[in-house]
Design a protein with these regions (language model features):
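Concave beta-strand-loop units of leucine-rich repeat
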Residues: 258-272, 278-356
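Acidic/polar, low-complexity intrinsically disordered N-terminal segments immediately downstream
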Residues: 21-154, 231-241, 245, 475
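Trp- and acidic/polar-enriched beta-sheet ligand-binding modules for extracellular glycan
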Residues: 301-303, 400-401, 429-504
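Beta-strand-rich modules
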Residues: 97-124, 194-222
Length: 504
């Protein structure tokens, strides 16, 4: 009898162990009278994994033998949808809500087991949000192509970075002969940053980029919406501002772009010359021809040499235009030394001042605001004495200042611009206060003023003894001329200086 009891206890332990999962997943409660109430076993280990425009729900089923179905409910605010699945199902892909796409929303997902008598298990709730084109992680991916430049039948691409997770990318386009063109984009090609496509294209048709990616938390491969590139031209802000200085364009006309065969680059500094690729018929670039300073100053890299900050993209643009259009470059002095000189570069040497007719300022002197304090002479008369060795220099102060230099010509006179001569600095460190921008205003009565230039503030060169011509947008008639310059900062002092101001 003792052994029989031991065997019975062991058998009971084995049975209980075998039914362990069922006991965990089958819930019982007791009424006040001790009657047990049995609940349907509920699923466990539920996960909601985001996919591309869907949410994948997975779970582990209860071993409750009375389960006949599984119920999945998903809702967002007042919208709700559901599905009944056969017992034993362990996964479901939620792709729509009431027949409509899920959209970029986070859904409450409720899973229950349904018994053969229609009773439901206790609910388990998880939350899931699909990946869509509006998901912030999807939006964080760039379009791979930064800019497309179209030059006759050719296309130049500039690239952004190949981001982690991108699986594949390619371009489609229409070839010159009307057939469909295809170019695969690879990490190696994109790393080049700049690329002249081999195919000749029909550039009246769009170019489309296709991309796919795989995010670590997404069960699907992401298929981005195809992106079309049209014929819209894109300019960097500094290049566009320089064209506005020269020509007054708020928006650069397409017809004007198409007509340009020669461009003059005199900007003190450009980020890049890649914008030259926007000009399909460009065959000559003239660099630094409108800066005039003594030849002895040409080696001054800080004040006498215009610069380009990204020589790699700039060299690429010049080489492509030389290859496609036979572009030549005329470079004066030693401007843009960062560029790699090529066979199509022509070194032109020093510049010569243009011949202009100066208005006679004999007997006229500039007035300054703020005026000199009593006992101090800034030598305003030096601005019109015709001697570049003399100069005007206001009192040095602890505060930054703007100086208004105005002159009354006595009567209205026709004028096309002002000529400014920079001071020749003996102290190289003081050179940093030389004006690099100027505002010019004209008036007929000395009360109402207007800008005759395309820009309110025009950049000027600051080399030792440099002669700067500020051309007006047209010929104006005025009696009063005003120039506004700002002080520079030298150690603890603020001041500036000029040698000559003339009007032509």
């Amino acid at each position: 009898m003792k052994y029989y009891g031991m065997y019975l206890a062991a058998l009971l332990a084995i049975l209980l162990a075998g039914c362990g999962e069922s006991l965990e997943d089958t819930y019982k409660d007791y009424s006040g009278e001790g009657m047990s109430i049995r609940y349907t076993g509920r699923p466990t280990n539920i996960t909601a994994t985001p996919g591309w425009e869907r949410v994948l729900v997975e779970w582990t089923n209860s071993v409750d033998p009375l389960i006949s179905q599984l119920k999945v409910v998903w809702r967002y605010d007042e919208e709700a949808d559901s599905v009944l699945l056969p017992a034993g199902t362990t996964t479901y892909s939620i792709e729509t809500i009431n027949g409509q796409p899920l959209g970029d929303r986070s859904f409450e997902i409720i899973l229950t087991s349904v018994g053969s008598d229609g009773s439901e298990s206790l609910a388990t709730t998880v939350y899931g949000r699909p990946y869509t084109t509006q998901h912030e992680e999807v939006l964080a991916y760039n379009r791979l192509i930064s800019t497309i430049y179209k030059i006759h039948d050719h296309v130049v691409l500039t690239f952004l970075d190949w981001q982690e997770g991108i699986n594949a990318a390619h371009l489609t386009y229409t070839k010159k002969d009307g057939t469909l063109g295809y170019t695969e984009l690879t990490p190696e090609l994109v790393a080049q940053k700049y690329y002249l496509m081999e195919d000749e294209l029909d550039n009246s048709k769009p170019i489309t980029v296709y991309r796919t990616a795989k995010l670590p938390t997404c069960v699907d491969e992401i298929e981005f919406e195809p992106m079309e590139f049209d014929n819209t031209r894109v300019f960097n802000s500094d290049f566009q501002e320089d064209l506005r200085r020269q020509y007054g364009f708020d928006e650069i006309p397409e017809q004007w772009i198409e007509q340009q065969k020669v461009l003059y680059l005199d900007g003190i500094s450009y980020n890049t010359l890649i914008d030259l690729l926007n000009f399909p018929n460009l065959n000559k670039v003239v660099m630094g021809s409108r800066r005039y300073f003594p030849e002895s100053e040409a080696d001054d890299a800080e004040y006498a040499q215009n610069a380009v900050l990204d020589p790699i993209s700039s060299n690429f643009a010049l080489e492509v235009l030389n290859k496609l259009n036979g572009l030549t470059v005329e470079r004066y002095n030693k401007h843009y030394p960062q560029l790699q000189a090529a066979e199509f570069f022509q070194e032109m040497g020093a510049t010569k001042e243009p011949k202009v007719k100066l208005i006679d300022l004999t007997g006229h002197t500039f007035r300054m605001s703020p005026a000199d304090i009593r006992g101090f002479d800034s030598h305003l008369n030096h601005l019109t004495d015709g001697d570049p060795a003399t100069f005007w220099e206001p009192r040095r102060t602890n505060e930054a200042n703007q100086y208004q230099l105005s002159i009354d010509l006595g009567e209205k006179k026709a004028m096309k611009g002002v000529r400014i001569v920079q001071r020749k600095w003996e102290n190289a460190q003081e050179h940093m206060v030389a004006p690099t921008k100027v505002r010019v205003l004209l008036s007929e009565d000395g009360v109402n003023w207007g800008y005759p230039t395309y820009l309110e503030e025009t950049p000027i060169g600051a080399a030792n003894g440099e002669v700067c011509y500020v051309d007006f947008a047209a010929t104006f008639a005025a009696r009063h001329v005003m120039l506004i310059v700002s002080s520079g900062y030298y150690f603890d002092l603020n001041f500036t200086s000029l040698a000559e101001i003339s009007i032509y």
